[in-house]
Every structure is written in C-alpha cells, then in structure tokens.
Amino acid sequence: MIFSQGASPLKGDFSRIKFSIASPESILAHSRGEVLKPETINYRTFKPERDGLMCEKIFGPTKDWECYCGKYKRVRYKGIICDRCGVEVTTKSVRRERMGHIALAVPVVHTWFFRSVPSKIGALLDLSTKELERIIYYEVYVVINPGEPGEKQGIKKLDRLTEEQYFQIITEFEDNQDLDDSDPAKFVAKMGGEAIHLLLRNLDLDASAVHLRTILKESSSEQKRADALKRLKVVEAFRKSYEPHRKVRKKSTGLFPEDEMPEPYIYEGNKPEYMVMEAIPVIPPELRPLVPLEGGRFATSDLNDLYRRVIIRNNRLKKLIDIRAPEVILRNEKRMLQEAVDALFDNSRKANAVKTGESNRPLKSLSDSLKGKQGRFRQNLLGKRVDYSGRSVIVVGPELKLHQCGLPKSMAIELFQPFVIRRLVERGIAKSVKSAKKLIDKKDPVVWDVLEKVIDGRPVLLNRAPTLHRLGIQAFQPTLIEGKAIQLHPLVCTAFNADFDGDQMAVHVPLSQEAQLEASLLMLSSHNLILPQSGKPVTVPSQDMVLGMYYLTKSRSGGVGEGSVFYSREDVLIAHNEERVGLHTQIFIQHTGRIDQKFDPLRVLDLVVEPGTEKHTWLKSQLEQKKLILTTVGRVIFNESVPDEIGFINRVIDKKGAKELIGRLSSEVGNVETARFLDNIKQVGFFYAMKGGLSVSLSDAIVPETKAKHIKGAQRDSTRVVKEYNRGTLTDNERYNQIVDVWQKTSNIVAEESYQILKKDRAGFNPLYMMLDSGARGSREQVRQLTGMRGLIARPQKSMSGQPGEIIENPIISNLKEGLTVLEYFISTHGARKGLSDTSLKTADAGYLTRRLHDVAQDVIVTMEDCGTTRGLLIYRNIEEETSGQIKFREKIRGRVTARDIVDTITGNVIVPAGETITDAHAELIQDTPGVEEAEIRSVLTCEAKQGICSKCYGTNLSVHKPVEIGEAVGVIAAQSIGEPGTQLTLRTFHQGGTAQGGISETETKAVNEGTVQFEDIKTVDHSAINEDGVEEDSVIVIQKNGKINLVDSDSGKVLKRYVVPHGAHLACKAGDLVRKDQVLFSSEPNSTQIIAEINGTIKFADIEKGVTYKEEVDPQTGFAQHTIINWRSKLRATETREPRLMIVDETGEVRKTYPVPIKSNLYVEDGQKVVPGDIMAKVPRNLDRSGGDITAGLPKVTELFEARIPSDPAIVTEIDGYVSFGSQRRSSKEIKVKNDFGEEKVYYVQVGKHVLANEGDEVKAGDPLTDGAVSPQDILRIQGPNAVQQYLVNEIQKVYQINAGVEINDKHLEVIVRQMLQKVRVEEPGDTEMLPGDLIDRSAFLEANESVAEKVRITERGDAPARMQDEELQKLRDITKLNRELRKNGKVMIAYEPALQGTSHPVLLGITSAALQTESVISAASFQETTKVLTDAAVAGKVDHLAGLKENVIVGKLIPAGTGLKKYKTLRLIGEPEAEAPAKEDA
C-alpha cells in the first residue's frame, strides 16, 4: 500500500500488496521529522513537547486548523506552516497518519530477522544464532576483512575474536590502522550491528547461490545438504526480491500525476543490509495515545515507554561518542541501545522482557500489537464495530409471520432516528433538525406514525452470538411493539439456536440501497428455509407445534360419528363444530387428487364399518375406485394448510414427517408457499397443543410389572458369571465384560417393555408417549430412566481408552419415578456433573476447530463454470453402511454432476448421461435399481480449476437446490457446515445424565431379513467339545480372518446385507441356506481375539518361560492359575531376545504351524498338550469402548483427522501386494517380510508386543495393515495415492459425525476442506526450473514452473554462439534453432543442447493449521497464527499478496471477491440501444 508524500493514504484501487524490508531511505521518506527528545507532553500546559514523541511540528496539530503557538487559527490558513512554531495548519486527523523517525547513533539489528527460526541473518552469513548473538551484543569481534595481518596469523573472514586476540593483532600491526578501510590489505574486525551491517553489505548473493547449489549437487553428507538447502532458500528469497534498477513507473500504477513516482517508492528489492537499521520509524501518535484520566493523571500506551527508552539510550550514546568515552562504556551503551530496540519491536520474545513499574507485566511491543486475538489483525481489521445497532432480550412472537420480527418502539426510534428526522422536516411537521429531535424526545404521537412509514419495507438484521453459520444472521421486516424485548418467530429459533431463557440478540440496520436489497432478497428469513450443510429444512416445527400436529392427525377408533361419509372439507368442519364427529374420528371424504398415505384403507375398513352391510359394500367399491379416502377429522383440518399441489396428507404427522413434508414443499412449490404453510401449521400446532390439554403427570409414567422378574433374572445371570470366574474358566476382564453385558441387556429389555406399555396406554393417547413418539420432547433413553431402570453408569475418566472399569458394574436398578437410594443417587451424580463440565470445556475446542477450518478454506470460491476435467470420484453402493444407518447411496450422489453415464448393468439402460446433474428423482431411481453398484461423479477433489473451484465439480447449492453460482464462497460455507455441528458434538453427554448406553457386545449375530446365505473368503474347521453340562457339542469354527457372509435376495440376487465374520466365530448356518429374519447366523466372543489351532498335533512352547515371558497369576478368590504373557524386555540383558510363540508339532517332532503370542495374552493350553482343529490355545483381551454417549472421543477424533496427525500407535501397512513371511527376531522388534511374484521384497520391523494381524503365508494387498492400530493417513497417501487418502478422510470424518451425533453433513463440504489439505506438493528434483529441492509449493505453481521450461533447452556446448550465451544456460528452443541455422550457413560450430529437465514432486498431506499458514496470501496467514514469522518470511522474499481470498480483502477494507463483489462485475459495462428521449410536454 502506497502513502503519498504528506497527504492521506491513497484511496487507490490497488489490486495487490507487496511486502518488503524498509530501506533506510524509505524510512526517512515516510518520516516528517526526527524525534530528538523522550518527552511526550509538558507537565504544566499538557501540550506536546517540541521534538518529543508527540511533537506537533512532526506529527501535525492537536486541534483542527490551529498551530501550536496559536498564531494561525481557522480553516482559511489551510496548508500554511507557522513561521514561529513550524506546525502545519491542517486537521488533527493527520496525527493518525504522519510518522517520525529516530536516527540511531550506531546501526542496530532488527530482532525479527535475527531471532526468527531459521535466523535470516544467520543463514546468509553461515553463523549460528548463538554466535550471532555474541557479535550483536558486543561480546566478540567478527573479522570483516582479514587483510595481511590476518593472513599471517591464519585468520579468515567471519572468524570470531575475543577482545584480547583483537588487541594483540592491533598492537602487533600498528601501521594497519593507517590504511583506508576499503584497502584489501587492511585487517578489519568489528562487533555489534555495525559489523553485521558491513558483512551483509559486502555479501555477494549470486556467488553464495552458486556455492550452495554446488554443495547440494556434489556433497554426499546429508547434514551438509540440509544446511545448504536451508541457507539457499533465504539467499534465493533475497535474490528474487532484489532486481536492481527496476523502477515502478507511472504506467503500472496510474496513481501519480508526474512522469515518475516519488523517490521513496522506487522499489529495487530487498538488500540484505536492510535487516540492520540506521533509523527507526516512529508510528503516528494517535496510534499510541496519551489518554487523560480523572485526577490529572494520564494513561499511556506501552509503546511510548519503549520509544522513550530507545531515545534516552540513543541520546546518551551520542553524547558519549562526542566526548570520546572509553570503548568499554561505549560498548555497554551500544548493547543497551540494541536491547531497547529489540524490546520495542518484539518484547515478548526476550527472556528478560521490559516490564511495567506497577503491575510488573511485560510491555506490549509493536509485534504484540499485531499478534493474537487482541492484535491489530483480529481485533480491528477482521472484527469492526458498527453503528446503527442495538441489542435486547428476545421473547417469543407466536402471532408474527415468518418474515417478521417485533422491534420495541424505543429501539426502533433510536435506530431509525436520522430517517425519522428527515421525514419530519420534509413533511413540515418540524422546522429544523433540532425541533424534530425535541419531538422525538417528547414521544409525540405523530412520531410513531412517521416511524411506521419509515420502517415499512426496510429490513433489519437480527444476529445471535455465537454466529456459527450463516443462518445466525437473518433479515426480518420489523413490526413495532410495546415493551423492551425483541419478538422472534418461533420457527427461526432452530437456525439461531435460540431459546427464550434470557438469550439476547443484536439488531443491525442495513443503510445503503444495495444492502437493503441484499437483505430483502438473500437474507430474509422466509428465503432461508434450507440448511446449507445438508440440504434439509431448518425451519421445522418443534415442541408444542409438533405435539399439536401429532395430536391433531392421530386417529382413535370408536369415536363419535365413526364411519360417516362427507362430500367436502367444509361439511366435515361444520359437523365437527356441531360436535357430530370427534377430532380423532375415522371418517370418509370425497377426494380424487394425489394422496400421501402409508396404510391400506381396505384393511382398516372392516374395523370402521361392520362387514357385510350395504354401507360396507358401497364404501369398498368407492375406495377401490379411489373416489373416497378414509381419514380423520383432524387430518382434514391439517390439510386446509397444505397446498393443493402436494395432495392430501393422510398420515400421522410427527417431527420427522413434518421435516420431510417441508423439504418436499420447498422443492415443489417454492419458498413463498412454504413460508405460508409454515405460518399456518404454527398456528394449528399451538392451538391443538392447547386444545388437547397435553401435560405430564406422574401417573403417566408407568413402570412395567415384569421389571422385578427381569432384574431377578439378571442377578441370577451375574451370579452364574461370578461362579464361572471362581471356577477359573473366566479371567477378571471377561467376568467384568459379561456382567456389564447382562445388565445392559436387562436394562434394554425393561426399557422396551415400558415403552410398549406406554404405547398401549389410553390407545396411544398417553401424553408422555405422545411427546416421545411425535419427537416433540424427550427420548427413549429418558423414558427408560423414568419408567424402566437407570441402568449402568459411566465412571468419569479423563482418557477414552476404554479400559475395563470405565462403567461401574453395579447398575442403578431404581428408576426416577420410584426414586433412587442415597448410594444410587451418589453414583449418578458422577456422570451428571461430568456432562456439565465437559460442555464448557469442549465448546472452546469446537470454536478453535471452526476457526482453523475457516482459515484454511476461506479462499475457495466458485470461479468458473466448468474446469473441463475428465476425472471423477467413484462412489460405491456400500451395503454395510446403508444397513448401519449411515448416509445412503442416493444421498451421496444427489445434486452432483455425473462424470460418466450411469448405466443399469442388468438392462443396459442409461439412467443419467454424463455431464448432467443427478436430481432427487434420479437419485431415488438409482437407489432402487439393483443394476447400479457405482456412480462416477464430478467432485471438488478432482477439480482442475487453477484458482478456486468450478461449478460442475461442486454440483448443486444445497440451500436452493440449483447449480452453484459463480462467486459463491463455498469454502466458508463448508467451514460453517462442519464447525457448527462440531459445537453440538461437544454438548452430548449432558442430556444422558452420564448413563452408559451402547457398547452391548453382541455374542450372536442374526439375519436382518430373510434371504440366502453366501460365503465369501470363509475357511472353517469342524470341532467337538464337552460343554458345562458334560454333553458333547459339535461346532463349525471360522479360522480365516476378515471372512464375510452375504445375505442375498433369493429372487433378484441382490446383496441385502454383508456381515464380517470374526476369527474364531461359531457358524450356525451353511452356504446356500435359506434363513428367516432374526435367525442366528454365527456367534462370536466379543471381548477377546482368539488364537485357534488349525491342525492336529502337540503343543510346544517356544520362548514361553515362567517369570521371563509369562507370569502366573493365582486368583485369590478362585485359587486358579492364569498364565499371562508379559513384556519381557525389562527382564533380559540388551543382547538377549525372546519371541513367545506356540508351535504345533507332529509325532516326529517336526513343527507344522507357529503362532506368535502377543503381550497380555492369556494361555489356555499347557506345554505338551494335544490339540485338535478348533481348540482355543490363547485369548488376547480386546478393550471395548463402552461409554457410547460421551462425545469426548468424537471431537478429538475429528481434529486428529483434519490435522492429518499420525495416530499414537499406528498400524504398520504393507506397500506392495504379496505374501507374508516372518524373518529373524531382534531384541525389541521382529521382521515381517512381504514378497510379491516379481521377486520384490519389503521388510517391516514390528515392535515386540504389537499384535500381528497377518499369519505366515497370508496374501496381502498394498495398503493392508499388518499389525493392529489405526492406519496413518500419511501411509495411505504414500502407498495408495492422493485419491485414496482424500476418500479415507472424508469417510472417517463422516463416521464420527454420524455415529456420535447423528449429524448429517453433505460430503461436498468435507471434500472442500480435504482438497485444501492436499493443495501442496514437495519438490523432489527441481530439474532446470527455479524451484529448490524440498520446496513446499502450490500444485498450480509447480505446474506453471514446469510449463515455463517446457519450450526451453539447456546449452551443453556453446560452439560459436554469441558471448552472451554460456554453457548450462537455458534458452528458448526456437531461438537456438534459428541461431544454429545461421551458424551452419556461416560454416561455424553449432550449439549443442538438450531438452530442459522438468521438476518432479510428490503430493503432501498438510493438517488444516499448516495448510492455513502455507496459504499463498500473506495477510491471511499473518492474521491466523505465527504473525511475526509469516511477516518476516514475506518481507525477506518480497512476497506479493494478490488479494484473492475473502480474509485479506476484509482486512484491507475492500469488497470480498465473492457474490456481487467478483471482479468481473466491477468491470461490467452496459452496452445497449440508447433510449429514445421522451418528448417534452407542451404547455397547456
């Protein structure tokens, strides 16, 4: 940004901002004078001291149009400089703009460039930070030129000398001092900033670059190359920014009237010596003000103190130099000056920071005023205060229309006062502004009439903090109300997340015509009915409204007038008003249009009208001909509000049904009709909730009589488990898990029974059941606690490791109706308190996640219609996901553009051709077509737009169900869509009161529907064993890992459900069996992984030694010994190693099979014991995370995925397809080898104690985990590539949101963020480009760099080429070809060349924090985190910010380049026929 000489900053239409290090000339050019004195204001007159830090001569007058001495007053003297006091007569606002400077007695190093990591000065001079510090702080001398004395003494340039060594050389070579400093024979050594300044000034950057590149190419030492690369990056940054004699002329800016720019704006790039300052800029005094307090004291900005310290020390140093003080004193003063300047620029970095006198806190330096939440970027530039706003408490406004809000008169008159005054004066009611104000203050009745007219058609914005997504600010048409609270429509509460328990909201008035238009068209609440995160309605009725609609549309048999037939809706309403039919009575009404019903009326007919009668026969024929419908009076009343296009809604409306209906209305009849419908059902809902008199009493909560029986059964089962444990057949861990399972099942059975009793009570009209079933309030979980039993309670724990003991195994048997005992109450307080504390702690985490998401995605804008990519994303139909309640196939493809034709493989029909948008109808059709197993869709992940993304790859805008428009800020919408539910994710445990739910380990797996069994990769053995009762039992045991059972539809052959069968499961069906629904398919041990014998033979222990690799634990209660494998490393010497394993040997003693046994395994066989296939040899306990309700696992998991962190205990993954074999054993690790058919072999070292999933000889595919643990996303990227890791991240994050919180987020939002995480590549070989190896650069920049050398060649031998062409130089191919033609013609030696090499790179997965800091925009990165580091790097490299994203434009005060702020709209010119002028009217 360029400041003109002396005038205010140019309000130029700049398109980019360049960052560079200020040269001493530019500092002086910006300055209006030197600050010589440390004083601020005179203690008596309170006027600024001349030449002080507040001087009027330098910074401008403190009063408008008045000089310091008072000689010139008034605006007529504008621009005159007073001859007495030297102050220019101008406005006092210049004190915010004009700068001064302090001329330093000695050069001082800028702390940012010295202390940054890596140190910029250190990199240029090849000095460590420690050594630099000693030079800068005057501890040692550094040799600048060794000269002849240096050569004789063996001293080289940059050697450090102590004081003694320095003086020894000086005394030895006395005549050296007589030589001129520029003489190469003179020995020169200095210390402090002056030495660094000289060294940097004498630096040859080009020579340094050549030298460092040579090291990179030729050095074999990895360390040397890494150091050289680090230095080369800094050298190259300076070289690129430093282009001598390149002047920025008028043509490029158009800002200056003269031919050339003023001298200070001629930019020649960064010179290294600019990092050492000879003058310091003094910022304008209004930015570091002195504020008078009462009692004659002043509050001052910390910067004034820091400046004062610099000036005092600088002045003292000047004096000491003048009086030729001894070197020791001078040196100390110079060091103190350096420290004072360091403190001024960055006080927080110093260990001994300068502190204030009173409160002993570190002073806020210039860096601190930029950094953090209170810094310039985030406090003043990203968040600005606004005028024309107010705030008040909100109350419900049930009579408002959806687009209205109630604004208190007292607020409205304040907000619209200027407009009211203008109208009063215009209409002649008031003579002047003053009298109009008086009328308003008196609250004259005429004022209210004028106010009504003023606000008519003027929307206001309502905002509730925290504004987590765009629906947190909406526009409303205000209606004036009495009182002091704002009235809010009940249906918009969901979007604002508002309730009426004291919430406050802010009101803002859009002033300009454009702002009002935007508010009315885009932000009006009746236009924002759909949630951008999922495309589902957000203005959904809740609580009383849902209950009222549910009550209204419910049917009851045996009511007054049941079976009556009506001709029209009017007749029904008349009959109901005359009480001839009841509200819930089943009746028949004539209707021939569209009907939405989910029951067969002919089945219900027999219950309503007696079969065999004439009426029954007639009604049956009418129903079959679809002339009549069977419905209730309430449904007729409800359908009065439903638009005719939707048809007759003939079902009970609960919350889910209402949401679906509103979604249909929105897409079929548009927003206007939907808003009208919403207002109508709001009225109906409230009215019938009141009319039904639905309230809860204690007698409505019915405890099932069978509860006692079930509890007895559970107590009996838990006693049996304890007996087994006492017999030694169970470990303590298994006992605990089984007891928890018993109580969990019992709790669920009791809950289900209490729910069924409620359902049957009063024919389904039990108020508690109605509230629950309609979705108005409460959940099954709460009913379980009220009427069943509270069940098991989670023990509050910090970690989410799922350790045994996370659930207290003694359940709370009582429910809340019966009341809890003291002990039960005490146990349950645990969870309830944890829930509340979690809420407050986790909200901050979610907020921080949202901020990082916004920062990483803020510059993703739709910039073009179609990027023309041929790539797409394959979406598969996943049976497991669909049946486990995750997002269905149709949801994933709806609203996307197809990359290829979607074809039904059975019929060969094309359902959706390539390049078309998949509509709702298409999506439903695809979901129901078994022949479509996959669809290739366009995706943000594969979009090839150079900047932003294209409309086709994004698909439809979810909030309007139309293709996304160019200019839509999809990045911010994505960040809001993920961040907003993130805050809900955190507030989860709270509502369950800490009860433990979920986590029942199912031992039996049953068929979800009937079908034919199909085995996939299943290997079994037959096994017979004697059970507890002494009876022999035969079973089929699965010995293959990851086998599957598919349940296939017998008719269509479509896979209905896929089950993964665990190792060691007992099969209860055979391949080809036809199974019924709920038939058991297999049973398995959920709490442990089993190691099972696969062949006959005898057990032989290998490396299983008592006290070394296993311990014998005798259970004190049972007396049985349990053998557990332990971590043996601590028991052995460093050279020894062990690998506990079980071997099966045959009669000859030959080993037939080996099984490694991991740490913590429990052995179930003895050495020498005979085994048959299917025998359990050992069990590895599995930790179960049973505290399903606690989200603590959810948010950190999402953060871990977005930050692309390597999991704490990652799985080892194979990089190639092949077969597994085990290699040698080391002390702390063992070898696993994977070898493929081509002879390629990879060796992996697995830590001892880690459970190996693969067995000897197993076939594995690249990317398969060999050991247990989470797979690292970095491994997926390395082995399977960017597409695989992108889909992995999207799917994993989706799982957390769906399973933990049931939150629906459309995939495209996650794709936008994940795309940003993979925008960078790391350069491997730079080829002949200007890139450096190891550089992290944008993918598009990498492609550009390669394109720049695509048409070029490298000269290998120059032949008789002109002198300007050298070997190894790059030239354009066509130039060389042309030149060679001429050389050949003249019989000269031609130029030999080879094609220029392009760079190579590999993709890099960055976490969102790193990605946000690595953004191309300097301003955006600086305002996010690590402000000083970002600015330092940008200044050194002379970076240019092209202002492409939203954040940087907000900061510089421009319109954001999204929506109507797009550049293409700014340059629009209307080209059309000039309108014919209207003929002038003739005088009558």
Swiss-Prot record:
It catalyses: RNA(n) + a ribonucleoside 5'-triphosphate = RNA(n+1) + diphosphate. Binds 1 Mg(2+) ion per subunit. Binds 2 Zn(2+) ions per subunit. Mg(2+) binds at residues 499, 501, 503. GO terms for cellular component: DNA-directed RNA polymerase complex. GO terms for molecular function: DNA binding; DNA-directed RNA polymerase activity; magnesium ion binding; zinc ion binding. Zn(2+) 1 binds at residues 67, 69, 82, 85. One of its GO terms (biological process) is DNA-templated transcription. Its EC number is 2.7.7.6. Belongs to the RNA polymerase beta' chain family. HAMAP family: RNApol_bact_RpoC (MF_01322). DNA-dependent RNA polymerase catalyzes the transcription of DNA into RNA using the four ribonucleoside triphosphates as substrates. This is DNA-directed RNA polymerase subunit beta'. The gene is rpoC.
